[in-house]
Amino acid sequence: MMQAIKSIKKHKEKKMKVAILGSGNGALAMAFEWSKAGHDVYMYDFPQFDKQVKAITAAGGIYSEGKMEGFQPVKYAGHDIKTCLKGAELVFAVGPAYSTEPFGKACAPYAEKGQIFVVCPSSCMGAILFKNALGLNIEDDSVIVSDTSTLPYAVRIIADGKIAVYNRLGGGVLLATLPSGKNDTVYDLLKPVNVCVEKAKNIFQTCLQNANPMLHPCITTLNAARIEGPDDFFFYEEGVTKGVGRLLKAIDEERIALGAALGLEIESDPHISIRQGYLTEENYDSAYATSPGFKGIKAQTQLDYRYYNEDAGFGLVLWVDLADRLGLKIPNVRAMLTIVSSIMGRDYKAEKARTLDTLGLSGYSIKELLKIL
């Protein structure tokens, strides 16, 4: 392992092979930026997601406008995971929470000793799930698996093989690693390109610093009739009022309390969002409604969307599970999960998409996990 770490230090000074798993908004932005930094980028996605893969292959790379501009080449975009992983020094898994395990399982037969994998963003302790999917115990150090608290970009695909980057974050993207003793190694590797990364204490911190489960289900629920109605509206500009903001604040305070119970300092979302470049005010209503970082984002056209299925079905479920283990009430988080489940006609908590048990951690106490992670 020491030899692998020594070689990583050299990688910062030379061209690396960087693999990107995924072909969504964030994956294209990550591929663009690492190619722009002079590295050889290889992209993989599953065969059913071939639209962007075909476009990138045809163009030979990715076009971008906004905060990152121009064209950057991609060495390979396709469905052969072995081609992407072979000899890759750095591998990013970029996608929603439900993509983490499939990506890990796809990598399992081809992962090489000493490789670094980064789940970006973690969403819900993604590094642990990814390591499980590789078939490795969380304490195994034959490969390094990290995750981040959020994406380094606000980005949308605006045409096949083309993205618009609205915000390239300048800070506030937390990074944690399994094993935690290797976090400095991964941080030093990422920092020259992803300048926004900051060191987290552990995987719990990257999980809880992600505020999407606080934001998206709440705003969606309090605007459910508008979403199901005939007219479009702007999700943040029109969807966040003073009343909505009060509920956001209550949920955020419970998220911060979860972190405190684990010995972690979790920043309020308005505070870290200012550092990230999303907000210009530190409050829970006008900050979101008037923020240039959220301007022009239309609401989803149906409730059956990732704001419920991912952010509640994975995120809030994990928060409630952690609270149960810690003996915390978090009444607003629990109420939100119950209401969302009723709206969708399904029991997200009973589905257990993401819990300590499904992460393979049921045999550990919280005290043991804090020591291991």
Predicted regions and their residues:
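NAD(P)+-binding Rossmann beta1-loop-alpha1 motif at the extreme N-terminus of oxidoreductases
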Residues: 11-66
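Rossmann-like NAD(P)-binding element
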Residues: 68-110, 115-118
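Active-site-lining helix/loop region of Rossmann-like oxidoreductase modules
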Residues: 171-271
